Amino acid sequence: PADLSALSRRMSDRHFGIGADGIVVIMPSDHCDFRMRMFNADGTEAEMCGNASRCIGKYVYDKGLTSKTQLTLETLAGIKHLILDVKNGTVNRVSVDMGNPILFVPKIPVNTSLSEIISYPLEIENNTFNITCVSMGNPHTVIFLNEMERYDLHHIGALIEHHELFPKRTNVEFVEILSPDHLKMRVWERGTGETLACGTGACASLVAAVLNGKANRKAVLHLLGGNLDIEWNEKNDRVYMTGEAVTVFEGEWNNNI
């Protein structure tokens, strides 16, 4: 269908649709193996989605659309490189080169005269949170908390997502440092709300943790939906994400209903 935004809203609805954080469309590309478009549950289009890119890698290989185990994927955030870990004829894990983190404020973007936002105090309803802003092709605002269960993350996340600082809104990551190589993360996604995982958010969280002296350049991110291995390579400044990709179910959608 031409209106992918409306389709995403219908399919993502947990009462009248399938129920999802959004939809991912796999398309042909003129200069990559495949092209992806990602639409959030509210119908807005995202630049890319790290977790969706892993799902695409599994889908195209398992469905026989490619026999390659190294793929290029065209996204609105640039070309992403995927490495597929294949066992017994199916993809088990996928590693994605997520590219270089963007810290320059106009490129994120953030409404401020500062060039970078690292541990910047932001007041939200009489509470001050130190935020670090990173783009992984889409905007992220990372906040470090101790005992994050004490906070109403849905309320805070929504307020920050729509804060006047962020002209294109922002994803919000709440991170608790368990150790320098183990981080606990919850995410409030722009246009969707809290989700079980966010690949670009996990990458942004590790970058922010390193910038604030809280983590090593390689760490495990513990999310509600599972774990992701994230590395910010010091030599080439690129961030790499590795995680599982699992088929949950298959079905057909009647768009005439």
Question: Across the structure, where does each feature detected by a protein language model lie?
Answer:
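Selected transmembrane alpha-helices and immediately adjacent juxtamembrane segments
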Residues: 131, 139-142
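Short, surface-exposed loop motifs enriched in S/T, G, D/E and P with embedded aromatic residues
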Residues: 82, 128-133
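Glycine-rich beta-alpha junction loops
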Residues: 100-102, 136-140, 245
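A glycine-rich beta-to-alpha transition motif near the start of alpha/beta enzyme domains, typified by
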Residues: 1-90, 141-257
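Membrane-interfacial helix-loop segments of redox and metal-homeostasis proteins
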Residues: 134-136, 158
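Short acidic-hydrophobic surface loop/beta-edge motif
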Residues: 71-73, 117-124, 134, 219-221
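Active-site glycine-rich loop that binds ribose-phosphate moieties when present
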Residues: 102-130
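Membrane helix-loop-helix hairpins that form the core translocation module of multi-pass transporters
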Residues: 93-95, 99-101
